[in-house]
Structure formats: C-alpha cells, structure tokens
C-alpha cells in the first residue's frame, strides 16, 4: 500500500476528527467539516457496527502516526509479544519511532515533515546519522538536528512553535542546541484521551 499524499482534510473528515496532519499547533481550517464524510456533498455519518467502530479507530491511529497497514500489523504483533497491556505497548512502540520523536521534540511541525527530515539524513541519534523513520528510539537516546540542517527555516519555525506550546514530559529539549533526550516511552495517562487503543486490540482479536 502506497503512502497517502492527498488532501489532509479528506482523511480528517473520514475519521471525524482532526488528526493534526497539517500541524500539531494549528487546528484545521473551519472549512474542513469534520462532521461530514469526504466529498463535496459528504453525507452525515450513519451508525457504525462494532466492527466498523473498531476499524475506524484502527485507521485513525494508523493515520495519526503515518504508518502503513503492514507496519501497523507488525507493531501490533510485537505489542502482543511484550508483557503488559497490548494496547499500551502498541502506543509505546508508535511513540518510540524516530520520526515521531523528532516531531515531539519540535524539529518537525508534523509527523510527515519529521519523517522527511529523517529520510533526508537531517537527524542524528547518539552522534550517528539515522535515516530510518521507523527506528526505535530507546530511553536515554539523544536526538539532534544535523549541523548542516540547523538553518533550515522549517526546523527553526517548527521549534519556535513547539516552544510556545511546550514539550511533552517524556522528552527534554535544548532548543539552542537543537537537541533533545528521549527520557522514556510515555505512559498512557500522558497521551491523548481521543485515542481508544482497546478498540484496535478488539479489532485484531476477531
């Protein structure tokens, strides 16, 4: 399955919520009618079956993190193998992706932009360039912007916006150095309550 590169509003309307695909700090334009399905004359949403609700939640989470279907299934399989809550394990794996950590540290204003920075070798982990967006960052890892990329306007602007909104508690960021430390994968209580990972567990348990 190819990565979706079409209108972000269309995806948000399909899921009925802002997925923050355009920016975590700016809400979608008011013209994006989240209560209607995609299309010029998007119909109001009908009642979904239990399966439909579970599928929509799985798609919503997958799209928030920008993960392809096969990758998402692999993350779920790994979450099952680990001790503890499968749903929470899944979110920790997604939050530990390098592109997501770069986004959380404010080096990219969206996860898509952060993924591009990683792919273009603009990000360093523990002193080594890493260009794999799915790379799993570990507690204590230091993530920084490569020296030659520090003057990129999108990074400077993204970091300024992130500073205004504040950084998540599970990362510490030195904005002047454009460097941050991944303290640990976040606890469930630190993440958005708009996500219901248990529905994903139920979806794959059928």
Swiss-Prot record:
Annotated GO MF terms: rRNA binding; structural constituent of ribosome
Record function comment: One of the primary rRNA binding proteins, it binds directly to 16S rRNA where it nucleates assembly of the body of the 30S subunit. With S5 and S12 plays an important role in translational accuracy.
All copies of domain S4 RNA-binding, residue ranges: 96-159
Keywords for the protein's UniProt record, in alphabetical order: Ribonucleoprotein, Ribosomal protein, RNA-binding, rRNA-binding
Domain of life of the organism encoding this protein: Bacteria
Annotated InterPro entries: Ribosomal_uS4 (IPR022801), Ribosomal_uS4_bac-type (IPR005709), Ribosomal_uS4_CS (IPR018079), Ribosomal_uS4_N (IPR001912), S4_RNA-bd (IPR002942), S4_RNA-bd_sf (IPR036986)
Organism lineage: Bacteria, Pseudomonadati, Pseudomonadota, Betaproteobacteria, Neisseriales
One of the protein's GO biological processes: ribosomal small subunit biogenesis
Alphabetized Pfam families for the sequence: Ribosomal_S4, S4
Organism: Chromobacterium violaceum (strain ATCC 12472 / DSM 30191 / JCM 1249 / CCUG 213 / NBRC 12614 / NCIMB 9131 / NCTC 9757 / MK)
Gene3D superfamilies: Ribosomal Protein S4 Delta 41, Chain A, domain 1, RNA-binding S4 domain
One CC-aspect GO term: small ribosomal subunit
Protein known as: Small ribosomal subunit protein uS4
Summary of subunit composition and partner proteins: Part of the 30S ribosomal subunit. Contacts protein S5. The interaction surface between S4 and S5 is involved in control of translational fidelity.
UniProt family annotation: Belongs to the universal ribosomal protein uS4 family.
PANTHER family for this protein: 30S 40S RIBOSOMAL PROTEIN, SMALL RIBOSOMAL SUBUNIT PROTEIN US4M
């Amino acid at each position: 399955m190819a990565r979706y590169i079409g209108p972000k509003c269309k995806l948000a309307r399909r899921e009925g919520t802002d997925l923050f695909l355009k920016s975590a700090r700016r809400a979608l334009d008011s013209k994006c009618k989240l209560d209607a399905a995609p299309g010029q004359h998007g119909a109001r949403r009908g009642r979904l079956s239990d399966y439909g609700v579970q599928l929509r939640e799985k798609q919503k989470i997958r799209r928030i993190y920008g993960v392809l279907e096969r990758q998402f299934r692999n993350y779920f399989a790994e979450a099952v193998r680990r001790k503890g809550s499968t749903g929470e394990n899944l979110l920790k794996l997604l939050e530990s992706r390098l592109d997501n950590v770069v986004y959380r540290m404010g080096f990219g204003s969206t996860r898509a932009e952060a993924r591009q920075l990683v792919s273009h070798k603009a990000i360093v982990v523990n002193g080594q360039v890493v260009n794999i967006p799915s790379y799993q960052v570990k507690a204590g890892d230091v993530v920084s912007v490569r020296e030659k990329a520090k003057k990129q306007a999108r990074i400077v602007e993204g970091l300024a916006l992130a500073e205004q909104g504040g950084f998540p508690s599970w990362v510490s960021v030195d904005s002047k150095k454009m460097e941050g430390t991944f303290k640990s994968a976040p606890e469930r209580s630190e993440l958005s309550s708009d996500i219901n990972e248990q529905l994903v567990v139920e979806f794959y348990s059928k």
